[in-house]
UniProtKB/Swiss-Prot annotation:
Example of a GO MF term: rRNA primary transcript binding
Any one GO biological process: cholesterol metabolic process
Compartmental location: Cell membrane; Membrane, Caveola; Cytoplasm, Cytosol; Lipid droplet
Gene expressing this chain: LIPE
Catalytic reaction list: a diacylglycerol + H2O = a monoacylglycerol + a fatty acid + H(+); a triacylglycerol + H2O = a diacylglycerol + a fatty acid + H(+); a monoacylglycerol + H2O = glycerol + a fatty acid + H(+); Hydrolyzes glycerol monoesters of long-chain fatty acids
EC number: 3.1.1.79, 3.1.1.23
PANTHER family: HORMONE-SENSITIVE LIPASE, TRIACYLGLYCEROL LIPASE
Name of the protein this chain belongs to: Hormone-sensitive lipase
Regions of compositional bias (Basic and acidic residues) in chain numbering: 616-627
Modified residues (Phosphoserine): 552, 554, 595, 627, 649
GO (cellular component) term, any one: mitochondrion
Quaternary structure and partners: Monomer and homodimer. Interacts with CAVIN1 in the adipocyte cytoplasm. Interacts with PLIN5.
Amino acid sequence: MDLRTMTQSLVTLAEDNMAFFSSQGPGETARRLSNVFAGVREQALGLEPALGSLLSVAHLFDLDPETPANGYRSLVHTARCCLAHLLHKSRYVASNRRSIFFRTSHNLAELEAYLAALTQLRALAYYAQRLLATNRPGGLFFEGDEGLTADFLREYVTLHKGCFYGRCLGFQFTPSIRPFLQTISIGLVSFGEHYKRNESGLGVTASSLFTSGRFAIDPELRGAEFERITQNLDVHFWKAFWNITEIEVLSSLANMASATVRVSRLISLPPEAFEMPLTSDPKLTVTISPPLAHTGPGPVLIRLISYDLREGQDSEELNSMVKSEGPRILELRPRPQQTSRSRSLVVXFHGGGFVAQTSKSHEPYLKSWAQELGAPIISIDYSLAPEAPFPRALEECFFAYCWAVKHCALLGSTGERICLAGDSAGGNLCFTVALRAAAYGVRVPDGIMAAYPATMLQSAASPSRLLSLMDPLLPLSVLSKCVSAYAGAETEEHPNSDEKALGMMGLVRRDTSLLLRDLRLGASSWLNSFLEFSGQKSQKTSAPTVESMRRSVSEAALAQPEGPVGTDSLKILTLKDLNLKSSSETSETPEMSLSVETLGPSTPSDVNFFLRPEDAREEAEAKEGLSAKDGSSRVSNAFPEGFHPRRTSQGATQMPLYSSPIVKNPFMSPLLAPDNMLKTLPPVHIVACALDPMLDDSXMFARRLRALGQPVTLRVVEDLPHGFLSLASLCRETRQAAELCVERIRLILTPPAAAAAAAPPPL
């Protein structure tokens, strides 16, 4: 059903239902139902022209006709999903409104929630129109730190978002993944209620289980608390929540469901410099120094995963670097025979917004990759922000990559084919490590597979970024906190600075006692909250419920103790050095801890975001049409007269626009790298999500590489959220998306001659 037909059908049904409930007397429920259908009619009629104008030019921003993907298309698709749900619900109401089994309260609550969502989507459509009218031809990102980007951030903190996290949670995604998203949201708000109320991380998790019931049975309460958490809590909260999967119990359960491998070892690479041959002249070498930024030289942890035990993986030299992860488990199986070294090697960088997770979190799907690819995999445990901001993670990943290339025999590989693979933040590191390898003149990988990568860390409005208003896994406020932490804007805080003095056994005793206390408090809190919730329900007033919930959340979660002064001198010096050398006014590449003279310019003077002349004319005509409709294309004109989006009830919050020159560094935002740097990249294969707020990062990066004649492919999976690799075993759709990533890696690891022989003959 096309957009216009869907809108007309919805308007007709809304008018019919509105007339019916208007004739049902002066009752409050009938009045609210009549009003909600009147609102649906108004918003649908106002939204349809805006979506039509976006859809008419969306094809101009695709990589090619076979890859129809960009933020404009995604926004239109999301709005269509909301319209489709309202159409289905309106038909149901029209068919069952006279039945004695018609659940009036339930249907009213759902209709009101989706009406709120439709209203906010209309606001986003108007913002997308302004982006289209303001951006340069062919550009998806608004260029500049102020202007539309700053305006959108100011609007974002005032827009109501709770409707997207309650009854409408995940409506845009495939139905099979929505129960998981609901579980995550319930866990998040429960975890947030106890964050910093207890000192034991395991205790917080246990207490959250007892208080999650009321959030499960009241979607409006859950949505309001989800909105409060995403806007107010700092990056340390998100780091703690995302690291729940690191708990031994949960990681053990995940590993039980994953493939069984012969080798899974944590290896500590010593911080010792070594020599690497130059690709231009193997007789010459360059020194690869250990990571130095912020904290000085230190070891780099990598995890070696191999389905079979291969030659070199059990050598004395490698065993001397193995780091213990706990008590050894008695191996009752016969010792496996060593197989020959693989010709391939995969170097993986995990995601987590640069602030959370480790190779352990991503081990389940990496084990499957090792089995399917028949190649050893090393996953880098790089240091995380805010304790170790840029460029520490890049330095560690580059050091580990060079070490793996030099010592691939110890890893069970001959190193004939090497692939870099990563998701989200790890995808960013794939590109920047390859760029740095080319700058040093050492071997670059044979290819890159990046899943939903972040290539633009500068604050910049784009159509896909608008989706962060409703994304349950990647809200804009959370994305902003992660980027600020990686850029060094977030202050490093250590609320549990006394842990080092306790020692290992002291920590165990403390956490055990705290866990028992938390279980007692959690059970009592659950009973009290359930009784309180029941009493509030009987009064049929929603505002007191939200207010009491808001008071029940520890206010300490909104304030952080200031860290010690004078302990971060090396970190401060590094940030000052980066700020001084990353000025957008200069043409020199900012030197990092490992300086290289020939990295190229940091300001992308030869970056070309322009369309072909014929496409530019078509887009210009569309802009003229938008200006004529709106009366003006000025940024200050937010919405048409008479339309008012819903505003948040959470109070005023601040989302500062972080515009440090560091985020414009091409080793932080590879999309901003100049052409001469991007030409050094190997073949790139990107797997993106159509509904990901970072979709435009993938689309624009692929378009830049394609314009430079670089080999690049872009595959876009539908109806899945950001981070689907960590959900690979959840449903059929995520498994298929993960298999697509494996297929791209296999393509990189296949030698060109073998790939040409396996290709089908031309028709």
